[in-house]
Every structure is written in structure tokens, then in C-alpha cells.
Amino acid sequence: MQVLIRCLEWLALGMNRLAAVAAVLMSLFVFLGVVMRYFVGAPFAFSDEFIGLLFATMAFLAMPLGLVMRRHIILDIVTRGLQGPLRHFVDIGATVILTTFCAWFLALSYDFADYSRLLDARSDIGSMLLWPWMAMLPLCTVVMVLVSLGQLFDSLRQLAGRPSLFSLAGEEEVL
């Protein structure tokens, strides 16, 4: 199980690096669009669509690392005062809720991307093929489901008094 957790951590790190590349490309196209608007009179015709697709790609590629590091949004106003087994039970419940949501989102986003592929959907102005961009949603969600299942297993281990298998989570976030 430890090897699987390490692989998921490395995959999340790699996805985060790709998210950084998408962010740099997005910034570059915004900058080029502004420069071209002043010197040429208009930006690339497809730049607004491309920037939107890069933004969605960046956001979804960055999510798994946030989950691995437990740096996502949490409601700690309730759990801040909890200690010991009760805190682990709350963490297990939260992980089950997240896993359920991700599985549901995975099914819907897969159908969405597949239907886009069947229609050969393209963007309005740039006529860019959309289904590869839409496929990022279910692909990233699969990784999130795997990470949350790993965290569920890890929380059960910690409930039994064993140390966490996740090395990227900070000491204060590990329950």
C-alpha cells in the first residue's frame, strides 16, 4: 500500500507541474493578447477560448496535490477541538463524503466528455476540438478518488495507532 501511496503522490506532483505549465501558457496568451490588442488591433481569434480551456485544465490538474497534502478547504471549526479517535472518525466521515462526491462527479464528467467526443464538439471561434480538454475532468477526478481512498485507508490505519503513509502532508495536517 505504501508503494501505491508514493505513486499517487508522485502522480499528483506531476499533475501539479502540468498545471503550472498551463498557468504559464495562460499568462503568456493573456500577455500576448494585450500586446496584440495595442500593436495589431486585435488578439488571436482563439485566445479567449484557449485561455478558458487552459484555466479549467490548470484548476483540475492542481486539485489532486491539494488533496494529497491536505491543503484543501476544510471546516476545522468543528474538528479543531477534537482529539484522538473521535478526530479520526470525523476525518473518515469527511473522506467518505469526498469520495462519494468524486465518484458521482466522475460518472457525470465522463458522460459529458464522451458525449462531446461523439458530437465532435468544437469551440465557436477557434474551432478547437473540445473533448480532450473535457477529458481532463474525469482523468483528474480518477486520481482524486484514488487519493481519497488511500486517505481513507490511511485514516483507518491511524485509528489503529499506526503512522500515516502520506509523506507530502504536513505534520500539522496529518490526523
Q: What spans do the regions from the language model cover?
A:
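Alpha-helical transmembrane segments and membrane-interface helix-loop junctions
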Residues: 1-175
